[in-house]
Amino acid sequence: MSNSPESSTPKQSIPARFPKWLRQKLPLGKVFSRTDGTIKNKGLPTVCEEASCPNRTHCWSRHTATYLALGDACTRRCGFCDIDFTKKPLPPDPQEGEKIAASAKALGLKHIVITMVSRDDLEDGGADALARIITTLHIELPEATIEVLASDFEGNIDALHHLLDARIAIYNHNVETVERLSPLVRHKATYRRSLMMLEQAAQYLPDLMIKSGIMVGLGEQESEIKQTLKDLADHGVKIVTIGQYLRPSRRHIPVKSYVSPETFDYYRSVGEALGLFIYAGPFVRSSFNADAVFEAMSQRERLSASIQ
């Protein structure tokens, strides 16, 4: 019998109301305003705004942001995502690396997180453009660590290796949901291909921190979350984020359930038993508190190395 907090409670197909644990105060202030001004002054899209992230005020009030590279429109139309869809995006901006570097300098970032729209219109999926951005950041901010949340490059392993050759601290690629729901949630992406890309990254650079993330509340079962965590661990992933799916608008996939904080704690214990570093909670997203997660994982690896 399952020991999860939700094992004895009935499932609701449609949540009746917004639970209290998903209500939060907005920490606006001078730091938020400065971050907002710095980003807009450089004309840079962020996933914070384009994807309607609920943590934007929190992160910007901490002088952190996640840059959205290769444009603000995506060649895929995933059912959970609020980023605009287009079949013909603009060419990559050759000055994007310099713009991100200038913004990161102004914000004093020591850990820079970059995500990207899927660019299926480009032969390499945008890997070279992203690698060039990373190279520029290394030149302009040599002390900063860089985390990249990349697309699946349509399974192009050469493109993945080219990106990884640019030297990053964390490679992140999200499976987003359990295998059964993946065809409903993700457009032109597959669960198994995502696992393959994660495994390829782990094999190519064994010391690289490999990260992935999943959303809950989409209709998944507890057993499926457990299997997903096992799959991720078996494919070389070291860090997993787990957060509540929140519907950006009525045209997106509806929320099937609101997962309790106790259940997030339970999933954390399941993942930790598999050797994973789990960051889980209702508002957790792939890049939420990414700097703190990176530091905690770094400390864990240093401790592990000292014991051996």
UniProtKB/Swiss-Prot annotation:
Pathway: Protein modification; protein lipoylation via endogenous pathway; protein N(6)-(lipoyl)lysine from octanoyl-[acyl-carrier-protein]: step 2/2
Enzyme Commission numbers on file: 2.8.1.8
Single GO term (MF): metal ion binding
The UniProt record lists the keyword Transcription: no
CDD domains linked to this entry: Radical_SAM
Cofactors: [4Fe-4S] cluster
Protein name per Swiss-Prot or TrEMBL: Lipoyl synthase
Species for this entry: Chlamydia muridarum (strain MoPn / Nigg)
